[in-house]
Amino acid sequence: MPSEWLLLATLVFAAYGAGQVWLVQLSSYPLWRFVGADEFRAYHAAWWRSIWGVVLAPAGLTAMASVLMIWLRPPRIASFEIWVGVGLQAALLVGTAVWWGPLMARLGAQTGGLDPKRYRTLLGTHWLRVAIVTAYALLIGRMTAEALGL
């Protein structure tokens, strides 16, 4: 029974993450170009502080739940599916630590506004992050349906 609860909790976290990453990609990031050069540094710093609870904490819980499923594998779920999920979470964490996090930290231009080249790079490469988060949510959704016999 604990494995089914873990799977359901992971489904909630994964669905939340998928909704959040699409909102960021389609709404939040595109709006950054409208922030004035004089205000961008303060805006970006406030944005960074604001995402810890609503973005980073749920993402961390999703990653931890993914790893916990190695030991608490739900019935009817093949171990390779668990490992695919762990791989997707690892790719997301490594990509964030190595690429997207540092890129976001350097979005401010020397002049104080948004660096247009880095901003375009973020908008273009962030689609990979959207794909990873979405793929994980779909995988967990399929696993939940399988575990519940749907």
Task: Cite the ranges covered by each PLM segment.
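Interfacial loop at the N-terminal end of multi-pass membrane proteins
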Residues: 3-61, 108-120
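Core segments of transmembrane alpha-helices
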Residues: 55-69, 129-138
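Transmembrane helix-loop-helix
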Residues: 68-90, 146
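Mid-bilayer segments of alpha-helical transmembrane spans in multi-pass integral membrane proteins
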Residues: 90-98
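Interfacial loop-to-transmembrane junctions
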Residues: 102-132
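Juxtamembrane boundary at the C-terminal end of a transmembrane helix
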Residues: 141-150
